[in-house]
């Protein structure tokens, strides 16, 4: 596994979307097939020995990593989406944004009682979206084994919000 290749494939965009932000652009990683393959391999190595029934990908960049990981691990893949994007009956959890409230939804039949669940997203910042996704999994009576992120912004302490559930990350800024 080549962590340096993964890290070097991510473009840093200063002052986006506003001054003072150092945006981590993963599109360059996705354009490098070997770096993308290394990222999926890093997730796989971390969880290959765990009994996971379902991998939940958080909209939208979480889908990019969760779907191939679910295929590689031989388990189900479930979408966690913004409100109004799923066509059947859903269950939701609201969470706070800097200027307002948003929500995350999943189909009510997406998780079975007792399913062991891994929740995947591209980046962990404050943890609000991941925590809300975990709340939906719990409402559906799934057991969260871990959260997994390509990138964690350690200074924002999102991992503390997700305790006591373990948090895995490939890169840290």
Annotate each PLM feature.
Residues 1-51:
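Active-site-facing substrate-recognition patch
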Residues 122, 127:
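Conserved G/P- and acidic residue-centered "switch" motifs that form tight phosphate/ATP-binding loops
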Residues 73-74, 94-98, 163-166:
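Short, hinge-like loop/turn segments at secondary-structure boundaries
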